[in-house]
Amino acid sequence: MSKPSVLKGCLESLVALEKTKRIPKKPSCDASPLISNFENWSGKPRKLYLRDARSMKRQGLPYELNSNMFAQLLASPMRLDKITRVRAPKELLVQIKLRKADTDISAARGKPFELRPSFGMERGHPTSYVSNSVALVHKYASSAMKWLPSSANSTIRHINQADVATQPEWYSQAYTEQMLGSLREALSSTLMHLGKAPESDPRDVIIVCNPQLPAISLRKSENPFIALATTVLNLYPIKDPELEKVVNNRDIELCSSKHRSLCFLIYRLLAFQADRII
């Protein structure tokens, strides 16, 4: 048999196979029962996953989590806490960056790199996370090298631990001052604009400076149709005269969704100093 006839026969066979190709049958269900009913056979509790906060209202669950400050904290992406080795929402942790050391530190210690906290959840530089607790950081300060970002030990970027300076003392000094400075500025700016325009959103957070109250508490809302409870954030345990002067013995009412960054900042500072407050 000649080559052209063999080639012709192969092409005819391929065409015949194409015509007789079976189309896969579409499953009767939209999602596999192994996914939709995972909790029934895995022994794990059911988890509720929603695409957006409004879907709860459509399903008859008016929890208003999109305007709940604590729900927003818990909804932040999960990260590994290098101290406790537990995954937690990153808004409840402190971001640590591996950076090139300042000139004076590099000259004094002979270490070209240092681990430093990042206040505003910055991008760039190798990153890790630790507990937002001054007590835990001081307790485990001797093992601070374990906080080194995993990417620092990759095959592309390998950094010797002997070249990294750790400064756990920043928790009680520079980092606290950085948070306090940002809080003073943010609170003063908010108060300047608070009364200039009418607030249409419900005010579900109250900032006070009261020695009689705990750092964080809940107060039953005067209007249950707007919010079941109001979160009270007490600045008194921080013991900062400038903040006390700004608050000036008054109750400052805020909307958590509108003043999200300020509410988060106060919560983080109170949680950071919680062991000292208690």
Curated annotation (Swiss-Prot):
This is Required for respiratory growth protein 8, mitochondrial. GO terms for biological process: mitochondrial genome maintenance. It holds the Pfam family RRG8. The gene is RRG8. It comes from Lachancea thermotolerans (strain ATCC 56472 / CBS 6340 / NRRL Y-8284) (Yeast). It is found in: Mitochondrion. Belongs to the RRG8 family. Required for respiratory activity and maintenance and expression of the mitochondrial genome. Keywords: Mitochondrion. Disulfide bonds: none annotated. GO terms for cellular component: mitochondrion.
